[in-house]
A protein has these predicted regions:
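Primarily recognizes the serine-hydrolase "nucleophile elbow" in alpha/beta-hydrolase
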Residues: 41, 147-195
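Structural recognition of the beta-strand scaffold that forms the well-ordered cores
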Residues: 33-36, 101-105, 164-166, 187-190
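Cap/lid segment of the alpha/beta-hydrolase catalytic domain
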Residues: 37-154, 160, 194-195
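Residues that flank catalytic or metal-binding motifs in active/ligand-binding sites
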Residues: 3, 16-18, 31, 90, ...
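Extracellular/periplasmic catalytic domains that process cell-envelope and extracellular macromolecules
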Residues: 13-15, 27-30, 94-96, 158, ...
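Short amphipathic alpha-helices and their capping/turn segments at secondary-structure boundaries
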Residues: 21-27, 91, 177-182
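Non-catalytic accessory segments flanking enzyme active sites
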Residues: 1-26
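Short beta-strand element of the alpha/beta-hydrolase
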Residues: 19-22, 30-39
Length: 195
């Protein structure tokens, strides 16, 4: 089962939002959930045409065994981006083994390019900007993982007491930070393991 959930971070449709893509195996009741951010958009982890295309800035890259340039239109996702990162997301294996998967596109939180402050959730919290403990891009990503965990606690189709946050590269650092600051999260340092 696929769900797409919009989390309104300030309670209004005009404020910042996270678009959570949640896959739940049909053969398990209330499965544990793997939660992680993705680099290039929810639509890239699976070719499913029903996944909403993001409107957030999408990085054009030729690194990480990816070439997102041809699928983008001015740093915005198109249908050509669908399934591009499916090899990095073993959805079928995870679902078959009875686990759920939730992900959010990291650029909806903070696109992390020079001058991206205005497109980041950080812009909605100006009172934090001059403090020594102001949150960085990785901190913002970790914060968003905690918001996904908050949502999962309200979803009766999954077991929010059994959650593992994951990520690789800088998104792995965000997962570790979320695990360190959120009592529900449990860090996992590899994204692929024998489940």
């Amino acid at each position: 089962t696929r769900k797409q959930i919009t989390i309104l971070l300030n309670g209004t449709a005009h404020g910042p939002a996270l678009h959570v893509l949640l896959y739940i195996p049909n053969h398990v009741k209330r499965p544990a959930v793997f939660v992680g951010l993705n680099f290039w958009g929810n639509e890239t982890i699976n070719a499913d045409p029903g996944i909403f295309l993001p409107t957030a800035y999408t990085e054009a890259t030729t690194g990480y065994s990816m070439n997102t340039g041809p699928c983008l239109d001015g740093h915005r996702a198109t249908d050509r981006c669908r399934g591009m990162a499916h090899g990095k997301w073993p959805l079928d294996m995870i679902l078959k083994r009875g686990y759920a998967v939730a992900t959010v596109f990291r650029s909806e939180v903070d696109p992390d390019y020079i001058g991206s402050f205005k497109d980041s959730v950080k812009a909605y919290y100006p009172e934090l900007q001059n403090r020594p403990d102001n949150f960085s891009t990785i901190g913002a990503w970790a914060w968003s993982l905690s918001r996904v965990l908050d949502y999962l606690e309200t979803d009766h189709d999954v077991d929010a007491s059994r959650v593992a946050v994951f990520g690789w590269s800088r998104l792995g650092k965000a997962a570790l930070w979320a695990a360190a600051t959120d009592a529900v999260a449990e860090a996992h340092r590899q994204y692929r393991r024998d489940l």
